[in-house]
Amino acid sequence: MNKRVFSLPINPKLSEEFVINTFLPFLHEYRDYILDLYFTCRIPPFDQDAMGDCYSDNIALIESAIYISNQSDIPLSATFNNIWVRPDQKNLDLWIKEFAPIYNSGVRVVTLPHTTWVSSGQIQAAFPELFIKNTILREVTKPSEIVSLAEAGFNYINLDRDLMRDRDQLLRIRKAKDYCAYLGKPVMISMLVNETCWGGCPIMPEHYQYNSTRTKDDPIFYASPISRVSCSTWDVEHPEFDLKQANLPPWRDDWVEMQELGIDTFKLHGLSLIHI
C-alpha cells in the first residue's frame, strides 16, 4: 500500500522563520508519507478562491510555495477552486496563458473547478505533464460522476466529505474507480478528513460562495453579520456539535479502513480563515 497518502496545505501566512525552522524540518522528516503540497494560487481569472483571504502580493505567494516544494522535494499542487469563475473559452485561454510560467517553474499538479475546460483537451495539449485534480466544491458523491470525470480527463477526484460515513456508497465508488482503470482512465480518489465542518452542512455552499467572491473591502465570513446563523454559534447551541463533524477519527484502524474502501489520499484542510 502506498505510503504517500497525505495532501498537505501550505498556509500562505507562514513566516520565513517558521518555514525554515519548523515547517521544512517537519516536511523532511515525514516526506515519505506526503503525496503533495497544495497552495492557493492567484492568477487571472482566479483572483479569489474558496479559502477567502486577500493578499497584497500574489506573485510572492507563488514563489514562496515553489521554494518550499523545492527545499522539501515534495511535489507542488496549485489550487484553483473558485467555481464562480465563469467557465467560458475566454477565461480558459487566459488561465492557460497565466499558468504557463508556473508550469515552466516545475509545477505539475493543479486543482481545477471546470469539467468543460478539462474535457476540451486544451489544457492537456498546452501542459502535457499536468496531473489534474477536481475540486471538492463540486460535491462528487456518485459512482457515475467518478467515471464521467475520469473520461473528461481528471486524474484525481476529491469526494464530497459527507461520504466519510457512507460505507456502502464508498464501496460503489471503489467499483467505479476499478472500472475507470479498466477503461484505461485510472484515477486517484481523495477524501478531505479534518475540516471539522458538519456533514450535510446546510450553508456550506453559501459560505464558500461568500469566500470566493470576497474582496479586500469585505469582512471575513465569520466577521460578517450573516454569520450569526452559521457554525460560529452552533458549538454552543448544539450539544451534539462534535458528533456531526465530518472528520475522520484519529484511530489508525479507521484510516486503514478508508484505504481499503478505495481512498488513495487524505487531504488535510488548508482554509486560511479558520473561525477561532
What do the PLM-derived regions correspond to, one by one?
Residues 2-145, 154-274:
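Active-site pocket-lining/capping segments in soluble small-molecule metabolic enzymes
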